[in-house]
Amino acid sequence: RLSGGNQQKVIISRWLLATEKILILDEPTRGIYVKTKADIYHLIDRLTAEGLSVIFISSEMPELINMCDRIVVMNHGRTTGVLSREEFTQERIMELSTKEL
């Protein structure tokens, strides 16, 4: 039986066997050990360096700030802001995530 982190790695590896150019990851590191998170982060970095686009969905702001080139913030299913890496702060993300449209 595989641990949760190893299960995540296997799932990502299966996706990589496909010839897709966009990978959508929804909370890919939730509930796994720090070491395994680091392994997944390194894998994602390698994939993006090779030209794969990754949509990374996470509720952990530090994770988003460290992993993303751009963050799209939503509230109740609507986009409230798009931030480039230079604009990332936890305060700005929180402000946009609670913004009413």
Predicted features by range, described:
Residues 1-101:
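Glycine-rich phosphate-binding loops of nucleotide-dependent enzymes
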